[in-house]
Amino acid sequence: MKITELLSPENIRQGVSFSSKKRLFESIAHFVEEQILAEKGEQACFECLFEREKLGNSGLGNGIAMPKAKIPVTVSDKAIAVFMQLDNPIDYDAFDGKPVDLIFALLIPENQCETYIPVLASLIEKLTDKNVLKQLRSAKSADEIWQVFEITDQSETTFEEVKE
């Protein structure tokens, strides 16, 4: 699965600021509810992200984090992705000790988690590529961020193609 099949341009936020990881998760949950879920899941999304983070830090190193969580099917029956480029890095307790300024959040329906394991591995590989990170950080708009993901996807074989 390509990034552009999972993420939509409308779910990219550029130039946002947060004081903490908790405020970031609150904002992701609010954004998801406001833009996608039509007032039926903000608290559930926040709690799922926050509880999942307690199990293990989602910082990938080099200033990027990929918070992810299982969400009830009653909240959404399809995966939801949000990308954020922060104005100011936040302390994230990442394993490398570096603050985080790029966030790729992924909310997966609880009945589809197994399907997304290979997708997560592919996302992590792409999101930790130093050239991709450099381009994402230098992007000045959500459109430029989207273009980075489109270019990244052009060089990818989709998961479905690999299975055949």
From Swiss-Prot:
InterPro entries: PTrfase/Anion_transptr, PTS_EIIA_type-2_dom, PTS_Nitro_regul, PTS_SugarTrans_NitroReg. Residues 5-152 form the PTS EIIA type-2 domain. It comes from the Bacteria. Keywords: Phosphotransferase system. One of its GO terms (molecular function) is protein kinase activator activity. One of its GO terms (biological process) is phosphoenolpyruvate-dependent sugar phosphotransferase system. Not known; lacks the phosphorylation site found in other PtsN proteins. This is Nitrogen regulatory protein homolog. It comes from Haemophilus influenzae (strain ATCC 51907 / DSM 11121 / KW20 / Rd). The gene is ptsN.
